[in-house]
């Protein structure tokens, strides 16, 4: 839009030891692209609880991965349910906030203007659609996404953000209101190992015992806990909380 204030929370996608000030986005140019497209659309609304879930998409890669991945899963499941080519439907998501709360909208619409009404026709069998979507997301053994579950040549441009496990977390929240459980201690150890050598260069030693992980510097020692990116960041004295998504996909944010 024309409001420059929307850029104030957009940070540099990298860290520099020479530049300490925030980016002012003074050279940005507003460009609006769009066209009228009349078609049928199905929208699924997921209400989020900001007390439990980090609802800020600019800093939470989980929210973007979960929304995009669940949208792709719903499209593939809908095409199987309707026995049509997946090119007949287009999918996407948006995160919105208003006085009523925070929401993720997953939408499906026909790829052709004034199409055959596929997107709306699936509304009558929404329960079967969600069940089939769950089967698709749970029926794979990959770590995030592959060509056996969510990836195909039409969505190559978003392959890097597809994550069937994040999609399952969002689907579980929508159906039961349950958050993903805490990261098991063994997995926390595994994820933190990727930072061990980097931290040693800065003079920080990672101490792992049977119950917890500690980061020890020259002047202080703090407990380190890896938490699910879906969660609102916990707060606890003398404890550093690190998102598991940052350790997997964006280590520079974890440091």
Please report, for each region that a protein language model flagged, where it lies by residue:
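Extended, highly charged accessory segments
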Residues: 1-198
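Structural motif
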Residues: 47, 111, 226-232, 242-246
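Short, flexible coil/linker elements and helix-boundary hinge sites characteristic
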Residues: 83, 200-203, 254
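Basic, glycine-rich
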Residues: 237-255
């Amino acid at each position: 839009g024309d409001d420059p204030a929307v850029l104030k929370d957009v940070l540099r996608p990298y860290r520099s030891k020479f530049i300490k000030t925030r980016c002012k986005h003074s050279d940005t140019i507003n460009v609006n692209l769009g066209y009228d497209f009349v078609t049928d659309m199905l929208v699924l609304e997921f209400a989020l609880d900001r007390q439990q879930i980090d609802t800020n998409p600019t800093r939470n890669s989980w929210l973007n991965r979960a929304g995009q991945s669940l949208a792709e899963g719903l499209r593939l499941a809908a095409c199987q349910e309707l026995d049509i080519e997946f090119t007949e439907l287009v999918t996407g998501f948006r995160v919105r906030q208003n006085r009523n709360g925070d929401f993720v909208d997953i939408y499906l619409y026909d790829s052709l203007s004034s199409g055959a009404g596929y997107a709306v026709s699936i509304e009558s069998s929404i329960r079967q659609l969600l069940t089939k979507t769950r089967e698709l997301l749970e029926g794979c053994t990959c770590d995030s996404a592959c060509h056996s579950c969510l990836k195909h040549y039409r969505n190559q441009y978003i392959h890097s953000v597809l994550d069937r496990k994040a999609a399952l977390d969002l689907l579980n929240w929508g159906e039961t209101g349950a958050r993903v459980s805490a990261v098991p201690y063994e997995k926390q150890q595994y994820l933190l190992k990727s930072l061990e050598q980097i931290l040693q260069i800065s003079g920080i030693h990672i101490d792992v015992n049977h119950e917890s992980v500690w980061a020890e510097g020259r002047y202080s020692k703090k407990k380190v806990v890896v938490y699910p990116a879906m969660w609102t960041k916990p707060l606890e004295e003398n404890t550093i909380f690190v998102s598991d998504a940052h350790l997997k996909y964006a280590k520079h944010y974890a440091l």
